[in-house]
Amino acid sequence: MAALLYFPKISSQMTSSHFISFSPMDLRRLSRASYLFTRRLKFIAKSRKCFHTSRYLQQCVHRPDKSEETSSDRHLHERLSSVLSKRSLDYEQCKQLITVLSPLEFDRLFPEFRSKVNPKTALDFFRLASDSFSFSFSLRSYCLLIGLLLDANLLSAARVVLIRLINGNVPVLPCGLRDSRVAIADAMASLSLCFDEEIRRKMSDLLIEVYCTQFKRDGCYLALDVFPVLANKGMFPSKTTCNILLTSLVRANEFQKCCEAFDVVCKGVSPDVYLFTTAINAFCKGGKVEEAVKLFSKMEEAGVAPNVVTFNTVIDGLGMCGRYDEAFMFKEKMVERGMEPTLITYSILVKGLTRAKRIGDAYFVLKEMTKKGFPPNVIVYNNLIDSFIEAGSLNKAIEIKDLMVSKGLSLTSSTYNTLIKGYCKNGQADNAERLLKEMLSIGFNVNQGSFTSVICLLCSHLMFDSALRFVGEMLLRNMSPGGGLLTTLISGLCKHGKHSKALELWFQFLNKGFVVDTRTSNALLHGLCEAGKLDEAFRIQKEILGRGCVMDRVSYNTLISGCCGKKKLDEAFMFLDEMVKRGLKPDNYTYSILICGLFNMNKVEEAIQFWDDCKRNGMLPDVYTYSVMIDGCCKAERTEEGQEFFDEMMSKNVQPNTVVYNHLIRAYCRSGRLSMALELREDMKHKGISPNSATYTSLIKGMSIISRVEEAKLLFEEMRMEGLEPNVFHYTALIDGYGKLGQMVKVECLLREMHSKNVHPNKITYTVMIGGYARDGNVTEASRLLNEMREKGIVPDSITYKEFIYGYLKQGGVLEAFKGSDEENYAAIIEGWNKLIQ
């Protein structure tokens, strides 16, 4: 009854009994009165179904006989045929027709009068019905329209309809198939009786071509899905369209699928030279050159003559596999078939030969192509330059560049970028910088790789000003150097004292909107803390958190280490608390930094207490943390406690390393307990831990201090037998020992040996030698060494002068030192005396 509310003229003449007498078809047509009516009265469909299936009502309701329904269909058929056969669309007639039409009725009737349809009028009808009335045509109806448009040579219109259909931009009557792509192909195939073979081929051509060209990202896969559907229904696309499909697959690097599709194509059409060439290209690019050569032979056996492109494809494939002899055979075969090699042929050969480092053959081909009237173009020269760069022949690449310029060819951005890559690989920072400047001045596009390579090279050569200038050029072009390069640059700037530049660069990146990663920020924090610029480091830490950037454990460890280095333990422990609050668990390195900081402040008890607290909080001490505790105790002259930590370490099965042993050995040597030190050295050897240079330094120095110099000399020789070369500290310890014993001849021997081994004396070496000669009464040699020391830029300290004067005092007083002294000695004595009394 709700229908009567929408049709007052009908309702005035009809009663409910009339409404009940409507057939299902009448109700369906009535429901098409308007789109609004259809939506509001969805419930009628259900009630109508129930109404007409009720056994009681089936006996009461009047049903029209078949002749009435046939008459109604004939009338609708005539109206549709009349509207769609006109030269232009009658809007009013169309509107009236749509109100009484269902999609299924149109789908059933449309093929019957297709021969009378004007394709343009039908297109307008479809547009009006779908766009203005949301009329849902079936897929078959759309495909029939596409076929009619193609039959009328209205290819563009047919293409637009198909694209809108694929994109889902038109309402479509739902079909049973889940995959709409297959459904469209299936609908086209179902119209085989409606069109001749040519139109069916055009339809399949259009579908494949639209998928491949309109949907570039995954269109070839869509086309590949529908291709078997069409092929199995006998709707084979043309050879041209098949080639479009195969080419699309090659461009998508789907070489195997291309070869499989080629096999399907061969079942429906006889491949021509283009199809064969595309398949050969797929085999070559897929690394199946042998299959490509076989297909080439099969092509010739089939009577299909290869063209220049076919030969070039095979030659390129053979070249990529290093089979250049066969490639040259195919080149000769080209000539035998009456085809001259082209510029592309020669370019392929030159590029492949240079990459294979067959430079002589490459030059031979280059000369041949010039003789044949194919002067190399920019692409050929660029390939040559690139190949030489890859082969490590930078000089040859530069020669080719010069030859290119002499032939009147201009360098391209590709040429510049390739040469820059070559200069960077060879570490030629000046040339790389010059070329990059030249590129920028010309206005060429510089790729990110060139910028990055040059900036990295400049940083390694400490040319930071140039590096920063190029970073500025990158930022002007909204190019980010990347986290790795930025980290390297900031680390380099900080390492060489350019902290203000590093700070400026860091802020510049943030203000430009680029994301600065945690590793880069950590590099800046490390540089500032290492330089003692804690205020700047604290400011950066606040900026990081204020901008919502991330701080990790490394960030906090860096700040804690910086605070401990400047003896700001309160701030260090404050960062520890903040670190924990942010959910970052301190690691052993964190604890070790703080323990070391406490020891450096002579807070030994606090360090031991903190160690115990850390263990209670879950710290599992490792060799590094034990090393810090042992070193701290030993430096605080609490060697016994250091030994206790060593014993605890062994009981916990934490294996000590050379550094741990060295801490204890050095402490025992300083306190004169050589037996304990030597015992530890034997323990090291027993455990397979080799003593290092520092181990022998402590032992030799310890022996020399207590005048056991000959034993120290034996350790010195033992060290050499272990493969360790003595350094200035070992020589100095022995010289000091012999000097105190007055054995200056042995001192001189050691000094000569130092010179022969290119080991240069340091301040301590000179001091102990001066003291030895002064005590021995050799004032002249002591003065000479003092002057030599100054000449080498080593500044004497108070200990040096003390040793110098002490020798004179031992010989009879300072006044005696002046007797018989020349001007140089006199000045040295006066200066030494002044230093002592200051």
UniProtKB/Swiss-Prot annotation:
Query: What lineage does UniProt assign to this protein's organism?
Result: Eukaryota, Viridiplantae, Streptophyta, Embryophyta, Tracheophyta
Query: Which family is annotated?
Result: Belongs to the PPR family. P subfamily.
**SUPFAM superfamilies (UniProt xref):** HCP-like (SSF81901)
Q: Where in the cell is it found?
A: Plastid, Chloroplast
Residue ranges of PPR repeats: 238-268, 272-306, 307-341, 342-376, 377-411, 412-446, 447-481, 482-516, 517-551, 552-586, 587-621, 622-656, 657-691, 692-726, 727-761, 762-796
Residue range covered by the transit peptide? 1-32
| Keyword Protein transport listed | no
Alphabetized Pfam families for the sequence: PPR, PPR_1, PPR_2
Output the Gene Ontology cellular-component terms.
Answer: chloroplast
Q: Which NCBIfam families would you find in this protein's record?
A: PPR
This chain belongs to the protein called Pentatricopeptide repeat-containing protein At4g19440, chloroplastic
Q: What is its main location?
A: plastid
PANTHER family, sorted: PENTACOTRIPEPTIDE-REPEAT REGION OF PRORP DOMAIN-CONTAINING PROTEIN, RESPIRATORY COMPLEX I CHAPERONE (CIA84), PUTATIVE (AFU_ORTHOLOGUE AFUA_2G06020)-RELATED
Q: What are the alphabetically sorted keywords of the record?
A: Chloroplast, Plastid, Repeat, Transit peptide
Chloroplast recorded as keyword: yes
